């Protein structure tokens, strides 16, 4: 088993797509995933197979699947293997597997995993010793906080964090603690969860006032929200720390059923802020959560033709689609300005429009629009045609259309359609193995390099292209 292939799979979403693995599990195809994990050395299938087997209590079979992956020494597989061994009751073997070696002493993931497995084995103090027995950094501090939650060791953790936090407060520039400013937030979190909320709030407020640590205002606002201190939170949200406090304040009001106050506060900020974009986005989200879709659109529609970052058109479309209002989202694509269309129609707007039409029962109209355009002007043209055929109820035509097509998008849609037809083995067969996917990726980037060399950009910037997904697929996936 090749570790480089495993690393590539994880870093490039290679192998069998996770969405397909989940669908196969939902259809009871665990044995098929076991077969593919072993035959193709497919990491996502191995994870899915282990998840399915463990859900059925078949821990020894799960170890049989994950064991060869763990034997490579690749850290994600080592951790997955140790978790399975713990569930098998083979505690000592799990600890031996996950114990960091000499060459891994600086590998944070290895020490985090070791500490978590120690806690899983009931060895909480040993986990604390393992983390604090090596040079501390901010990730290790947060690992210490995470692995000890609910383990009855808060006082010990506070004894460890207290001196570090005090040094940071006294002189954050000293070399010993310059890289440990998160000790302030970590100490506050542990004080809060141990019930010492007034002490936590006092320290957090002082740190925010003195601007100690990164994101002190946000930490203070979040703590006030978690403690239900709405009056104090309002003071923050209407003062110099408003940028950090508004979202926690609005969400706290909403949780209390005081949505009218939340809306009023946001509308006031939209009217008065020099740069209201963040508040407009929060207002859009708030109104969407309340099911007030038309009001949400009206609140931000003045941004829909902006050519800069403050444009909330796509955000509104995605939120509406998530609520099943594809029809209303589709309406937002109409009436856009010529300047906006010139900059955005070919890039993403029409792809999103076709997706929304497909979801709204207008797949045939979308396909007609698509086919009227020159073929070289539409990215992922053939997979999009196939998807629209399927949305129009012509699934077999869509499958036949996809079979000869190259490319990740084509075989992903094909596999999804086959799963929907209950043709599970065919769906797996439609997915190229890892070596084929790697070769496809190399060819893609080679073509891109040749294209850039042949037609250099007028601006000197390299054009960006994405080999994997068309813009319209983002929300649906």
Predicted feature locations:
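Solenoid-like repeat scaffolds
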Residues: 5-11, 34-42, 66-74, 99-106, ...
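Structural register within alpha-helical repeat arrays
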Residues: 19-20, 46-49, 80-81, 113-114, ...
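Alpha-helical segment of the N-proximal tetratricopeptide repeat
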Residues: 6-36, 42-56, 80, 84-86, ...
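C-terminal non-catalytic interaction modules
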Residues: 395-396, 402-404, 411, 415-477
């Amino acid at each position: 088993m090749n570790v480089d292939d495993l690393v590539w799979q994880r870093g490039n979403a290679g192998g069998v797509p996770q969405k397909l693995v989940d669908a196969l599990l939902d259809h009871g195809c665990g044995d098929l995933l076991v077969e593919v994990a072993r035959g193709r050395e497919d990491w996502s299938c191995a994870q899915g197979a282990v998840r399915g087997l463990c859900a059925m209590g078949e821990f020894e079979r799960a170890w049989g699947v994950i064991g060869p992956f763990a034997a490579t020494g690749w850290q994600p597989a080592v951790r997955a293997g140790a978790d399975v061994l713990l569930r098998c009751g083979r505690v000592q073997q799990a600890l031996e597997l996950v114990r960091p070696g000499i060459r891994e002493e600086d590998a944070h993931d290895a020490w985090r995993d070791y500490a978590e497995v120690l806690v899983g084995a009931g060895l909480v103090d040993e986990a604390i010793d393992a983390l604090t027995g090596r040079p501390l950094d901010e990730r290790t501090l947060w690992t210490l906080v995470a692995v000890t939650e609910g383990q009855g060791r808060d006082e010990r953790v506070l004894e460890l964090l207290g001196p570090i936090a005090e040094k940071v407060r006294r002189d954050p520039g000293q070399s010993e603690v310059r890289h440990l400013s998160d000790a302030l937030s970590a100490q506050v979190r542990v004080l809060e969860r141990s019930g010492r909320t007034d002490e936590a709030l006092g320290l957090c407020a002082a740190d925010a006032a003195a601007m100690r640590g990164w994101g002190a205002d946000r930490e203070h606002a979040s703590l006030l929200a978690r403690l239900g201190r709405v009056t104090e939170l309002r003071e923050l949200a209407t003062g110099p720390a408003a940028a950090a406090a508004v979202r926690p304040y609005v969400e706290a009001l909403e949780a209390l059923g005081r949505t009218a106050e939340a809306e009023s506060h946001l509308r006031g900020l939209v009217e008065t802020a020099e740069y209201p974009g963040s508040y407009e986005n929060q207002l859009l989200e708030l109104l969407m959560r309340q099911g007030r879709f038309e009001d949400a659109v009206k609140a931000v529609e003045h941004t829909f033709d902006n050519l800069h970052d403050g444009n909330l058109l796509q955000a509104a479309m995605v939120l509406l689609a998530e609520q099943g209002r594809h029809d209303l989202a589709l309406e937002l694509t109409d009436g856009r300005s010529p300047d906006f269309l010139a900059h955005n129609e070919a890039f993403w707007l029409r792809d999103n429009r076709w997706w929304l039409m497909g979801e709204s029962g207008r797949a045939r109209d979308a396909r007609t629009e698509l086919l009227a355009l020159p073929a070289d002007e539409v990215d992922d043209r053939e997979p999009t045609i196939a998807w629209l055929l399927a949305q129009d109820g012509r699934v077999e035509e869509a499958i036949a259309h996809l079979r000869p097509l190259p490319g990740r998008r084509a075989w992903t849609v094909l596999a999804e359609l086959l799963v929907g037809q209950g043709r599970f083995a065919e769906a797996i067969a439609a997915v190229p193995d890892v070596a084929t996917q790697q070769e496809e990726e190399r060819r893609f980037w080679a073509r891109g390099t040749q294209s850039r060399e042949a037609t250099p950009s007028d601006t000197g910037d390299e054009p960006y292209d994405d080999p994997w997904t068309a813009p319209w697929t983002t929300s649906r996936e």
